[in-house]
């Protein structure tokens, strides 16, 4: 609401999955994934056709939509697929108007195909970069997250000490 967004879309891919996983617990494998979040906080997970069952098993978000825009880069035809649309997703999270403001976080992880799909679905929408929202959200850490980070660094330090002991000219 502070950014005057009707929807925030956070996208991820196999190599950089953290943002979609942050909200959903799901991370894509060879496809892309996105989370659409309304200003009221209602959310939906968007995945490609190959991720339907994995997403249903892993996601903490119950609303899961299969969009062709999130398919793998090999661009399979999927003749049997009746895909969901961005309009379906937005309607499910309570965004029904057409003239809206859409923030896209993980902008660099948003493929041209995904962006074209958003623009085609909402030609009157204002689409803005919203990476700063994800950066701000992920910079706040809980006590458990801090403990996990400390443990990760402790393990990495032990591994480095072992490597240094093993190195020979």
Model-derived regions: residue spans:
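A composition/biophysics-driven feature that prefers long, compositionally simple stretches
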Residues: 1-159
């Amino acid at each position: 609401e502070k950014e005057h967004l009707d929807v925030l879309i956070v996208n991820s891919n196999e190599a950089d999955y953290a943002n979609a996983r942050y909200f959903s617990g799901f991370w894509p494998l060879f496809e892309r994934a996105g989370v659409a979040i309304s200003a009221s906080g209602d959310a939906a997970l968007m995945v490609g056709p190959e991720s339907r069952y994995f997403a249903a098993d892993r996601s903490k978000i119950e609303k899961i939509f299969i969009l062709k825009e999130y398919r793998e880069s090999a661009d399979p035809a999927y003749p049997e697929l009746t895909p969901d649309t961005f309009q379906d997703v937005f309607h499910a999270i309570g965004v029904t108007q057409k003239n809206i403001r859409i923030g896209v976080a993980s902008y660099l992880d948003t493929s041209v195909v995904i962006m074209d799909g958003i623009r085609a679905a909402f030609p009157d929408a204002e689409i803005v970069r919203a990476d700063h929202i994800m950066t701000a959200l992920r910079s706040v850490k809980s006590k458990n997250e801090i403990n996990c980070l400390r443990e990760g660094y402790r393990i990495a330090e032990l591994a480095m000490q072992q490597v240094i002991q093993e190195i020979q000219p």
